[in-house]
Amino acid sequence: MVQSEMLFLAKGDTFNPDNMAASTLFNTYFGSGLSSIVFQEIRESKSLAYSAFSSYQTANEKGKANYVMAYMGTQANKIPQAVTAMMDLMTNMPEAQKQFDAAKEATLKKIAAQRITKSNIFWQYESLKKLGIENDNREALYNTIEKMTMEDLRNFFNKNIKGENYNVMVIGNKKDIDFKALEKLGEIQEMDVDYLFNYEKLDTLKM
């Protein structure tokens, strides 16, 4: 396997409905799609990964935690540079007004075009109810996002993304991976492939 898969995951704060608008816009601007900051910086500008994205995943139930996630599919020999680039982005959010405006427009159009019909009305109601939201919140999200500025997004990033401690998962050919580069991220725990992909019975973890 020439390509290595890397997943960065951090447990965030407990779900807060007041952050839904900011997290929705943030995901479009920062981590999702070909025009996002993460993809443009890591894939297009620096050619450090085949694919890359990041997202702030909100909980699906009130009282549960949100999660910060980032992913890269990169060549094993590019792991050191790719990790440095990703961690820099997850610590210091680049601010590009043109991309921010485009992300806001795309997010607003997506909300405006969303149609919930038939049985989906019930399931949407149930999903919102689990979050402690008693009514359709799309209009409120739209109005909030419409008024948001880069400063609002920066404040959201600094409070919810910057400074998080990540668990990093790597899948790849062991002989091609730079373990010294990974050691800079923390303690390494190697998992046996038979443990990960054992479909017959679960054995004890081989270290």
What are these regions (language model features)?
Residues V38, A82, F156, D178-A181:
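Hydrophobic side chains in well-ordered alpha-helices
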Residues V2-T14, S23, N27, F39-E151, ...:
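M16 family metallopeptidases and their MPP-like homologs
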Residues E151-N158:
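Mature hydrolase/peptidase catalytic cores and their serpin-fold inhibitory cores, especially
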Residues V170-G172, F179-G186:
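Amphipathic, charged alpha-helical segments and their helix-to-coil junctions
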Residues N16-D18, K78-Q81, K175-K180:
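Short, conserved charged micro-motifs
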Residues D18-L25, F30, I177, G186-Q189:
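PPIase-associated folding chaperone regions across multiple families
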Residues L89-E95, E183-D194:
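A common structural junction motif
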Residues K184, V193-M207:
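Extracellular/periplasmic ectodomains of large secreted or surface enzymes and adhesion receptors
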